[in-house]
A protein has these predicted regions:
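Boundary at the C-terminal end of the N-terminal hydrophobic targeting segment
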Residues: 25-29
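Extracellular cell-wall/glycan-interacting regions and their flexible linkers
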Residues: 30-31, 49
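...with weaker cross-activation on analogous glycine-rich loops/strands in unrelated enzymes
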Residues: 181-193
Length: 193
């Protein structure tokens, strides 16, 4: 419906903006545990996979249809819970960075530390489980984890689109005609346009 389409477009914009701030982080607090299922009925992404890094397999890839009642609030709640799980990271691009030698120097956002990469590995794998590319992405990451860097290796593939796909899935949007889950942002942005 037209109203649903406008809502989806607004939610995509909101999630992309939040994701830009949430995953690049300069300032972050300690990560929080997720809320219990009786407080926020969400399938934790980590429960969608099993096994340790290097031997991870997919347990669940489907999304449940919850209905469109109060969907905006649910999507925001799901995304906020994950932001807390990652420590409420915030990027302030309006301030000067004293470590940059000049305004034109390359700025690279901080990455997760090896211990943090290991802590969130199954959650990020869980995000991938709702995308069409889930099997080969997780298999390729298993090979990375089995390599020289070991289980604390960072994700080989950018996972922000998988995260947004998972948020929309857990938000209750199960039908591809409402939101096409994907491993690349352009897929659902094209759908929204």
């Amino acid at each position: 419906t037209p109203t649903c389409g406008k809502t989806i477009k607004a939610l995509i914009s909101l999630l992309l903006a939040a994701l830009a701030g949430a995953t690049l982080g300069h300032a972050a607090s300690a990560p929080l545990n997720r809320l219990s299922e009786d407080v926020l009925d969400v399938v934790p992404p980590s429960s969608r996979v099993s096994g340790p890094p290097g031997k991870m397999t997919i347990r669940q890839g489907s999304c449940r249809s919850i209905g469109l009642t109060d969907i905006r609030r649910r999507i925001v709640d799901v995304a906020t819970q994950e932001w807390g799980f990652f420590g409420f990271s915030v990027v302030d691009q309006t301030s000067q960075d004293p470590e940059r030698s000049s305004p034109r120097s390359i700025h690279r956002p901080p990455r997760l530390a090896p211990w943090e990469s290991l802590r969130v590995a199954d959650s990020i794998a869980g995000y991938w489980t709702v995308t069409p590319d889930r099997s080969w992405i997780i298999e390729r990451q298993n090979r990375v984890w089995s390599g020289p860097s070991g289980p604390s290796a960072r994700w080989r593939d950018p996972w922000s689109a998988a995260f947004i796909s998972w948020v929309m899935c857990e938000g209750g949007i199960a039908e591809p005609n409402q939101f096409r889950r994907a491993s690349a942002h352009h897929v659902y942005i094209d759908q929204a346009i």
